[in-house]
Amino acid sequence: MDVLNKVPVREQEPKVRATNFDEVCLGYNKDEAVEEASRCIGCKNAKCIEGCPVSINIPGFIAEVKEGKFEEAYKVISESSALPAVCGRVCPQESQCEGRCIRGIKGEPISIGKLERFVADWARENNVKPEPAKEKKNHKVAVIGSGPAGLTCAGDLAKMGYDVTIFEALHEAGGVLIYGIPEFRLPKSAVVAKEIENVKSLGVKIETNVVIGKSTTIDELMDEEGFEAVFIGSGAGLPKFMGIPGEQANGVFSANEFLTRNNLMKAFKDEYDTPIMKGKKVAVVGGGNVAMDAARTALRLGAEVHIVYRRSEEELPARVEEVHHAKEEGIIFDLLTNPKEILVDENGWVKGMTCVKMELGEPDASGRRRPVEIKGSEFDLELDTVIMSLGTSPNPLISSTTEGLDVNKWQCIVADENNGKTTKEGVYAGGDAVTGAATVILAMGAGKAAAKGIDEYLSQDRKSTRLNSSHLYISYAVFCLK
């Protein structure tokens, strides 16, 4: 056995997958999973666990896989993660658990994400469920939002015995997992829906089409409906734009809208009537995972697609795997390039985009080298569609209808990073609603921390638990074009 290199994972051929929405990565089979698990040396001081935001016992579950004990491996994972089939597919393992793997010092790290995915898929196919709480607690908790933060918080609280209800604004649960990430990366019915069923099997109730701030408010939930604590995991769904001329033209979309139409509303399926712009020449502005998702979706809808990003490939925020897949599929990367103006025809439709070439100067506040325009380097791209993928911010609806809930200048909820506690008693928050747009696993970590904080809150004397906002710590997402 080659212990230095990963067991290769099967994928659809690039030319084939570029024409369909089936999952790109086909995952390990049993033999491949056992072989890959056998590369793990089972470190006692496991750095990989330190790199996992939800602290999965990685050597523990891999040891079970090595022995072919897949159900036991699932039990180990489900102690820490409510969404293992999701995480195994979309987490940036290369910068987290796998980035800490000792095997990576001499050779390639263990394929932790692919092994997690294998175990979760095996459990689903064999109808293995997480174990519900043995004892119930007489406390009601409301969770706002059914994305990764909300599902994780709800699942952990249910395991502790709490009576948990999730309130979801959309008609379908899943948050960014269903509207933001394409089918070819994260299958909805085969994976996401089953993960949500597992959370519900713990006793969690989910109410859809409930918009907090309109249908009801946090104060009403607590004062009139008997919820003793609330977790806000409502995400960050308001898109950002550049503010350049022509941005209001027909044919300009946010990546958020474009992906929602395709992913949640199934515009890519002929049997659905959801309208979506199927451009012939498309530019996606931005360099993060969302930009890659939008570009690869537009490609599958029949377009020639350009990624326009103002820094170099080294600074691309997207996962290396996503960039690699995009290149394999034929996405054109216009790097060190920045839009100046969207060109509009006499009927108000996009006809092109004026761009300027950039070079990297001194590092800015983010630590990355600041892009600087090269004078006289302007050029035009002929286009009919522009998709802006510049990051998102939280919707202010919840904060504006909740007295005593502080937000910062970006409209992110002010919350303690250690336990999710906000400035309003009994209210906790985490995920993108606090940090701005970040990753699925970081949102899950925040949901897990908040569940622990809520448990501590409901288990103690609650005479004085209000937190001064000056003691809170906030981290901010680095958006695509910063």
Regions found by a protein language model. Give the residues of each.
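Glycine-rich dinucleotide-binding loop and its adjacent helix/turn
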Residues: 119-135, 192-211, 239-301, 408-418, ...
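A conserved FAD-binding loop/helix module that cradles the flavin
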Residues: 433-458
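N-terminal Rossmann-like FAD-binding beta1-loop-alpha1 element of flavoenzymes
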Residues: 140-165, 291-299
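Ferredoxin-type iron-sulfur electron-transfer modules in oxidoreductases and energy-metabolism complexes
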Residues: 17-36, 57-89, 106-135, 262-263
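Feature captures the FAD/FMN-dependent oxidoreductase FAD-binding
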Residues: 135-136, 140-144, 196-244, 341-354, ...
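FAD-site-proximal beta/loop scaffold in flavoenzymes
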Residues: 248-279, 363-437
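Rossmann-like dinucleotide-binding cores of NAD(P)H-dependent redox enzymes
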Residues: 163-166, 170-201, 206-207, 295-341, ...
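Single conserved hydrophobic/aromatic residue that forms the stacking wall/gate
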Residues: 467-482
